[in-house]
C-alpha cells in the first residue's frame, strides 16, 4: 500500500460548526445573504470540485484558481475554504485547516503491475526488490 493521496475539502479549524458538506451549504447561503458574495473555494482542481459540490447540493460558491500553496489561501484572505490533495493531512493541519467528515472528493493510491517475464529478469527483479523494500521502510517510518 503506497502512494495514497486524496482530493479533499478543507475548512479553517475555527469553523467549529462546519463538520459536513450540509453544514458548508448553510455557510455558503449565510455568506451570500450577509456579505452579498459567494463562498470562495481555492483549488487546482476546478472540474472535480464543481462536480462534487454540485452533486452535494452546494451552489452558492465560486472557484478561485490556485497556482500553488493552496493551503495558504484562507490565511491570506484569498478564499474561505480549499480543495487540495493530501496524503497525511499534516500540511493542512500546519495551516489550521481540517478535512470535512464527508469531504473526500476523490481517493487514490498507486498500484504496481509486474509481468512474470520481468520477474525472471535478474536486473528488473533486483530493482523491484529495492523499490518494495524502500516502500516498506517508508510505510513503517510513517506509522511511527
Where are these regions (language model features)?
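Domain-level signature for soluble enzymes in the chorismate/prephenate branch of the shikimate pathway
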Residues: 1-144
Amino acid at each position: 500500500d503506497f502512494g495514497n493521496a486524496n482530493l479533499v475539502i478543507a475548512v479553517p479549524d475555527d469553523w467549529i460548526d462546519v463538520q459536513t458538506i450540509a453544514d458548508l451549504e448553510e455557510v455558503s447561503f449565510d455568506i451570500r445573504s450577509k456579505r452579498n458574495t459567494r463562498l470562495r473555494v481555492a483549488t487546482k482542481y476546478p472540474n472535480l470540485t464543481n462536480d462534487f459540490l454540485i452533486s452535494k447540493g452546494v451552489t452558492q460558491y465560486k472557484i478561485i484558481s490556485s497556482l500553488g500553496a493552496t493551503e495558504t489561501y484562507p490565511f491570506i484572505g484569498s478564499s474561505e475554504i480549499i480543495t487540495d490533495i493530501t496524503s497525511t493531512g499534516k500540511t493542512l493541519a500546519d495551516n489550521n485547516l481540517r478535512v470535512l467528515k464527508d469531504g473526500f472528493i476523490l481517493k487514490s493510491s498507486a498500484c504496481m503491475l509486474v509481468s512474470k517475464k520481468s520477474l525472471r529478469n535478474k536486473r528488473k527483479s533486483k530493482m523491484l526488490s529495492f523499490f518494495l523494500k524502500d516502500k516498506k521502510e517508508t510505510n513503517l517510518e510513517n506509522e511511527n
